[in-house]
Structures are given as structure tokens and as C-alpha cells.
């Protein structure tokens, strides 16, 4: 089917490439979501991700900051960035999710990838373009959609190579258009909501430090009781729990994406003692850090 007469879409359509020898991975997911599947807390992963919204609007929470997004917006997420989508009640929201991973350490391509992926590391993670510029990107996505429907590409080196090269054309086009981004966050907050989102953003960038309710109260010139009450009201989380969840989510990421010692990860994620880290990790994850790492290795 066509959405807005210009975007090819089909429920539960996937484009998957898992080229293990060359460390190239793609996962295109055309599907719809509604409010019933909204995540409780933000998550993160070791690959790049693009959300292309095909519904009227939604919210994307990135490192504790909510971004209001509209149909045709692209949300670009670098590895290890904490985020979650918030879909609204009513009709399910169509969207395209693209996850991908490249071998970024190869000398012959590392500089090129660093440059072409720079939009994923910009301060503004949401991209909105004019109809003409947006159509340049949609044309490439439509080409990939049609190709995946007409070819038995999986496991065919030539077909997978075509998809890989076509998507790099998409990334380069996005890179060329990055300075024409017209997005501005039209999410409206009252003054206390704005302050609370500043606090949550601070937590995401300073979770490795010694932060607490008392510290944040002084940092943002808010009384502890007021901050505690309003933080829970705005985010749905107790402030101390939010800090611990942010630390544990980052610890989980490091456990499966690095070979660091568990004690080093605990320290880097802001825990004052290893026993405290173990206790909180078990409480949130339902397993020990060591078992969490082992299960991730077995599942690969």
C-alpha cells in the first residue's frame, strides 16, 4: 500500500541482512504500534537506529528529553543512546524502524563512516525536511522496499550487496541534507515540566557521578520535597529509582558490548560499592551481572 501516495508500506514486512563474516547487519521493520506497547523505561542497544514515523504524531523520549514528532520525521539514534517511543491512544501508529551495524574500525572505511554517520551524533536527533528533500530519501526507501518484494535476497551475496549499497546512498543523501533540517521541538511544557526534563537530561549525562536528590535539589535550585514530588508526577518514576534505572541500563549495555571487568563497569556507572551494584542489578534485572553477561553471550 501507499501512505500519503508516496511511501510504500506493508504491515509486518521485514528486510533482514545478517552478514556475519563482514560484520554487516540490517533490520528493516515495517509495522504499527499503539499505546499498549509503550515501554515503561528507556532502552539502549549497540547498533544505529532510524525511526521513520508514518503516523500523524508520536513522542520520542531521548536521554530523558521528550521530542514531539510528526509524519515524515526521521529520528536518528547512535549506539548506546537511551530512548523510547511513546505512541498515543487510538488507531495504531505505522512506522519504519531501521537498525544497522557496520564494521567501523576498518582503516579503508572508518573515516568515511565517521563522516557519513555524523548526523546521528548531532545535538538535535530529529530531522524534518521539505517535501522535495524528504522525497529524495523516500525514493530510496521505496526502491529498497520494492527490491525486497521482488527478490529472494536473503543469503544472495549480490542482492545483499545491492541493498547495502542502496542504503549507503540513503545515508549519504541524509548527510547531504542535514543542514536543511527544519525540525524544532513543538512539545509544550509548563515551567516545572521544563525544569524536570532538564533534571532527567542531567541524570542521563551524569549518571556516572555521585548524584542524589539532595545534590540535584541544589544544582537546580528546587527544594528536595518539591523536586521529589514533581519528578514523580512528570516522569512517573521516583527520582532515586530513575537514577538507578539509568545506571543499570548503561551497565547492562557495557556487560554485553565490552570485556570490561564487572567491578570496573559498576564504578563507571556511578555505584559507590560493588555490593550495592550487585544488589540493585539483581533487583532490576532479576539476575546477577555475571549471569546477565553469560546469557547474552550464549544468545549471540
Residue positions per predicted region:
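Generic protein-terminus/edge-of-domain signal
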Residues: 1-74, 81, 89, 114-115, ...
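Ligand-binding loop in jelly-roll beta-barrel domains
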Residues: 80-105, 110
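Aromatic/histidine-rich interaction motifs
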Residues: 112-142
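Short, Lys/Arg-enriched, Trp-marked, Pro/Gly-tolerant hinge/linker segments that flank
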Residues: 123-135, 151-201, 205, 209, ...
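Terminal helix-turn-helix DNA-binding modules in bacterial transcription factors
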Residues: 201, 205, 210-217, 222, ...
Amino acid at each position: 500500500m501507499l501512505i500519503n501516495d508516496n511511501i510504500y508500506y506493508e504491515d509486518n514486512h521485514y528486510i533482514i541482512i545478517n552478514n556475519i563474516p563482514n560484520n554487516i547487519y540490517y533490520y528493516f521493520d515495517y509495522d504499527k504500534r499503539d499505546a499498549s506497547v509503550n515501554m515503561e523505561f528507556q532502552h539502549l542497544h549497540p547498533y544505529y537506529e532510524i525511526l521513520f514515523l508514518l503516523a500523524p504524531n508520536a513522542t520520542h523520549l531521548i536521554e530523558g528529553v521528550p521530542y514531539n514528532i510528526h509524519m515524515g520525521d526521521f529520528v536518528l539514534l547512535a549506539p548506546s543512546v537511551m530512548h523510547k517511543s511513546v505512541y498515543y491512544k487510538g488507531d495504531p501508529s505505522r512506522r519504519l524502524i531501521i537498525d544497522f551495524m557496520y564494521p567501523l574500525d576498518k582503516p579503508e572505511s572508518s573515516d568515511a563512516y565517521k563522516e557519513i554517520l555524523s548526523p546521528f551524533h548531532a545535538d538535535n536527533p530529529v530531522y524534518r525536511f521539505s517535501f522535495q528533500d524528504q522525497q529524495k530519501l523516500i525514493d530510496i526507501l521505496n526502491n529498497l522496499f520494492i527490491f525486497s518484494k521482488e527478490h529472494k535476497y536473503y543469503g544472495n551475496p549480490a542482492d545483499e550487496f545491492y541493498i547495502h549499497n542502496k542504503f549507503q546512498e540513503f545515508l549519504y543523501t541524509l548527510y547531504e541534507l542535514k543542514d536543511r533540517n527544519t525540525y524544532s521541538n513543538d512539545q509544550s511544557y509548563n515551567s516545572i515540566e521544563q525544569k524536570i526534563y532538564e533534571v532527567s537530561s542531567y541524570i542521563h549525562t551524569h549518571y556516572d557521578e555521585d548524584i542524589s536528590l539532595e545534590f540535584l535539589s541544589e544544582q537546580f535550585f528546587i527544594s528536595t520535597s518539591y523536586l521529589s514530588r514533581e519528578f514523580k508526577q512528570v516522569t512517573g518514576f521516583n527520582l532515586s529509582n530513575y537514577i538507578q534505572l539509568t545506571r543499570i541500563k548503561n551497565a547492562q549495555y557495557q556487560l554485553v558490548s565490552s570485556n570490561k571487568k564487572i567491578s570496573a563497569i559498576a564504578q563507571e556507572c556511578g555505584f559507590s560499592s560493588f555490593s550495592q551494584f550487585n544488589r540493585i542489578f539483581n533487583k532490576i534485572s532479576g539476575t546477577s551481572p555475571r549471569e546477565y553477561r553469560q546469557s547474552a553471550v550464549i544468545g549471540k
